[in-house]
């Protein structure tokens, strides 16, 4: 049963679909076959054998069928994703945003900095699963993060202000990507152990801790700009810099907003 208001439906991006090399090859073959069919038809008017035309027609139908199979395959591989107030539906499964663990592989190629290749997520108490981003527009990730943040930000702020700590495991993207990008469903479950033993960023109402290095809000500037987390002293000397484009951070958008929120909250005495 579907609950709450439907906010957005993300569908397959067919422009990405038709940019796939094998689809381009198929299109070229279809184009060549059309030319062949046209040429043979013209030659038929001059008295050529009917079998040539029949062969061309059969090839044309075969290419059309192959094109249909490709479309069917990609439609099933990249199903619609429905976003509601409290959850999203992917492959008929309802996944709640609250306490959802996730991270994503960034596409660091030139001109692709706003792209992502995969989202790996684990519902509260569930198993790790993945969404292949190659068949969707970047809008999918924007909606995903916005919905997640709306459901978890206020709760995280309240926890920190009450004396609690929000913890964000992080790891080198290359390590995680090489190990899990093509993993089976069973292999993905190792991610839980990987992140339990990974370095962690901890946010409290007094400070941010980067793998046991503590920086309090009052004496340091802590910024999370696009692609980089920077810690600097009050004289603007950089103390620590983490390039997030090469790092996977669990619940990265939540970490970014918490850092922005608490860094502004505390006055700096230069």
Where does each model-flagged region fall?
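A short, sequence-level motif marking secondary-structure junctions
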Residues: 97-103, 133-139, 218-222, 243-249
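Alpha-helical transmembrane spans
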Residues: 13-79, 186-193
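Short, exposed beta-strand/loop patches in secreted or surface proteins that constitute
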Residues: 79-83, 198-203, 221-223
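Eukaryotic low-complexity, acidic/Ser/Thr/Pro-rich regulatory regions of large signaling scaffolds
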Residues: 230-270
């Amino acid at each position: 049963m579907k609950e709450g208001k439907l906010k957005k439906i993300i569908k397959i991006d067919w422009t990405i679909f038709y940019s796939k090399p094998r689809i381009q090859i198929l299109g070229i073959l279809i184009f060549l076959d059309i030319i062949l069919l046209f040429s043979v038809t013209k030659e038929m008017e001059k008295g050529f054998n009917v079998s040539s035309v029949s062969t061309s027609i059969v090839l044309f139908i075969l290419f059309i069928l192959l094109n249909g199979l490709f479309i069917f395959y990609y439609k099933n591989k990249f199903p619609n994703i429905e976003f509601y107030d409290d959850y999203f539906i992917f492959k008929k499964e309802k996944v709640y945003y609250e306490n959802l663990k996730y991270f994503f592989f960034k596409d660091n190629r030139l001109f692709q900095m706003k792209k992502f290749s995969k989202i790996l997520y684990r519902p509260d108490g569930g198993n790790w699963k993945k969404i292949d981003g190659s068949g969707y527009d970047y809008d999918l990730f924007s909606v995903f993060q916005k919905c997640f943040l709306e459901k978890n930000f206020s709760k995280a702020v309240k926890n920190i202000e009450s004396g609690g700590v929000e913890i964000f495991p992080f790891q080198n993207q290359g390590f995680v990507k090489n190990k899990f990008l093509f993993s089976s469903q069973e292999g993905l479950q190792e991610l839980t152990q990987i992140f339990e033993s990974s370095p962690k960023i901890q946010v409290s109402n007094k400070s941010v801790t980067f793998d046991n290095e503590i920086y309090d809000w009052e004496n340091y500037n802590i910024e999370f700009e696009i692609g980089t987390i920077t810690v600097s002293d009050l004289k603007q000397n950089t103390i620590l810099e983490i390039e997030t484009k090469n790092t996977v951070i669990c619940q990265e958008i939540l970490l970014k907003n918490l850092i922005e929120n608490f860094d502004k909250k505390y006055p700096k005495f230069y």
